[in-house]
Amino acid sequence: MSEALNVDIQEIAKFEKMAATWWDPDGEFKPLHQLNPLRLNYIDQTSGGLFGKKVLDVGCGGGILSESMARLGANVTGIDMGNEPLEVARLHALETGVSLNYERCTAEEHREVNREAYDVVTCMEMLEHVPDPLSVIAACCDMVKPGGYVFFSTINRNLRSYVETILGAEYLLKMLPVGTHDHGKFIRPSELIAMVDQTELLCKDATGVTYNPITGTFRYTSSVEVNYMIATVKPLE
């Protein structure tokens, strides 16, 4: 862990090694490609539409979500600390002609010159990969405008999530490389909401996400036992 930055060097290194396959729909990031339509729809519908809005994607990686939000007409900036994923993201945007901006920085660094600058902030599948998730949540709160939405997604920490996400997805189904996740870093919904409550953000909605290995598709569910997303809003002043 860096002393100055909220970064886990080992986590960054894992995703640097896999970066070349980020946009392969049948590669190591296949689950993200399968999940993306669901999370994109949730963000778009819950926020009242992304078209014309200024959006920040925290922990954007290779840009799967960032690019899809830009395709809906959002003015998107994606930030990440991985050099290789960002290079992949920039190259793919050039190849596909999608206009958006990528920067290498932490959420805390980006906040210094972007307070209350965004209509929507997304932080998806990222909190379980940093040493201090509360610090990221606070930075996201500071960067969204009053009345704007901040979205988080992560994985619950319990026996079922260990069986499905690590034993199932990494070891049995080979959906993800072994070691992608650390069960000890998963975040219970109560813990996430407790952290959100330490900021100005108000939790407005939560939904679970479940995977069907037979059809290879994700769908919404009322259960937040494994994967889940929450929508928060910053109150108007």
From Swiss-Prot:
Keywords carried by this UniProt record: Methyltransferase, S-adenosyl-L-methionine, Transferase, Ubiquinone biosynthesis
Reaction(s) the record says it catalyses: a 3-demethylubiquinol + S-adenosyl-L-methionine = a ubiquinol + S-adenosyl-L-homocysteine + H(+); a 3-(all-trans-polyprenyl)benzene-1,2-diol + S-adenosyl-L-methionine = a 2-methoxy-6-(all-trans-polyprenyl)phenol + S-adenosyl-L-homocysteine + H(+)
UniProt xrefs under SUPFAM superfamilies: S-adenosyl-L-methionine-dependent methyltransferases
InterPro entries cross-referenced by the UniProt entry: SAM-dependent_MTases_sf, UbiG_MeTrfase
Residues involved in S-adenosyl-L-methionine binding: 39, 59, 80, 124
Pathway: Cofactor biosynthesis; ubiquinone biosynthesis
Superkingdom field: Bacteria
EC number(s) on file: 2.1.1.222, 2.1.1.64
A GO biological process held by the record: methylation
Gene3D superfamilies to which the protein is assigned, alphabetical: Vaccinia Virus protein VP39
Keyword Lipoprotein attached: no
GO molecular function terms attached to this record: 2-polyprenyl-6-hydroxyphenol methylase activity; 3-demethylubiquinol 3-O-methyltransferase activity; polyprenyldihydroxybenzoate methyltransferase activity
Pfam families the record matches: Methyltransf_23 (PF13489)
Record has Methyltransferase as a keyword: yes
PANTHER family on file: METHYLTRANSFERASE, UBIQUINONE BIOSYNTHESIS O-METHYLTRANSFERASE, MITOCHONDRIAL
HAMAP family cross-referenced by the UniProt entry: UbiG
Role, per record: O-methyltransferase that catalyzes the 2 O-methylation steps in the ubiquinone biosynthetic pathway.
Similarity remark: Belongs to the methyltransferase superfamily. UbiG/COQ3 family.
Cited NCBIfam families: UbiG
Annotated protein name in UniProt: Ubiquinone biosynthesis O-methyltransferase
